[in-house]
Amino acid sequence: MAPGRAAFSRFPRTGRLAPASAFFEAVTMNSIVNARLKQIKPSPSMAAKIVVDELRRAGREIADFTLGEPDMATPAHIARAGQDAIAGGDIRYTSPNGTPGLRRAIAGSLEQTLGAKYGLDQITVGAGAKQIIGAALTASLEPGDEVIVCAPYWVSYPDMVLLNEGKPVVVTGPESQGFKLDAASLEAAITPRTRWLILNSPSNPSGAVYSRAEMRALTEVLVRHPRVWILSDEIYAPFCYGAEAHVSPVQVEPRLAERTLIVNGMSKAYAMTGWRIGYGAGPADLIKAMSTVMSQSTSCPSAISQAAAQAALEGDQSSVTEMVAVFKARRDLIVRRLNAIPGISCATPDGAFYVYANVAGLIGRKGPDGELKTDLDVSLFFLRQAGVAVIDGGSYGLSPYVRFSFATATEVIEQGMDRLAAAVDALMAG
């Protein structure tokens, strides 16, 4: 399986827009880069951010819906903890798996939210949840091992598997199914080479949230396949807006805890994307191996960021509640505005802070740059004609869609939707 297409970047020296994959090929031609890495695409959201920043520097006004980054400031008490760490000289190396204080705070949070108990030797801390996922795959995959991923998926999952010589096995969760994996599809995808199932609920990019019944159906399959481990990416756990609260596989089926890695972090819930703290909780032997991997890459997470993360988990949680309420209002706004635009439709996501909008009604239309044949063409049309930046659905493994992040100011949503509506009206009239 080839990973989804990347977004867009720039050719070196020429400055003209090009697919990020073409950029990657241009800069690695005749280089020392190994064959495995040549399969890997740059992150589409990061590539899009580069283009958006360049366009803004050139004076273009862009409504940016590409990055999943809360626009709020890190809560003051968390930032103060980081400042206090600096002032107090807490600026040295820590253990590769994180400070005991932070790991105790993580254990307390997991017991409170999931009802699951983890010892300090079952928890490790890294430079963001992405590093935790990467370390788990590095520590566990043998060449050719298979990892099941549900499309639409977070863009990094397949490439991280490939980077570690595994094979991504993509199973589509269609829109008619709420963009979710069902038990029958999971059962059919499992082979003797299957090593992991990656679950992400709430989901990036679709906002899908698995109900307890849906999670139960998946865990019943997994119980029958003891070789298959579960990587449960729960970074968006607080962001649930509907009747269904977040549920983890270890809550539904505690027997799976012995082969489940819970992944979470500080970036989303506490507006700490730049602090770079994520964590994993799971069986001690896996955690030890992951910590060894990270000790040979980053040595340890930032001591300053760890102090702030501990304050976040142990302190007042009202900022999280307030953020969720703000994002729910933004979700309602962007869904209403998108569904009012001809050729675009979207369901209301139950979680995270993304809308995965269906743009099938725009495919085949002719814009100023030619026919819109793919959702990548649609995303480029939005950028060039409306100054609206989104990520194409092909990058997430399922077309014809585009992803909007609503982790941005209400005014940006309103302005972006106004410009998008005008551009699409002109397209439909052409």
Q: Each PLM stretch: what is its role?
A:
Residues 23-33, 37, 41-64, 68-85, ...:
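PLP-dependent class I/II
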Residues 63-69, 84-103:
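A glycine-/small-polar-enriched, mobile loop at the entrance of the PLP active site in fold-type I
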Residues 93-126:
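Conserved N-terminal alpha-helix of the aminotransferase class I/II PLP-enzyme fold
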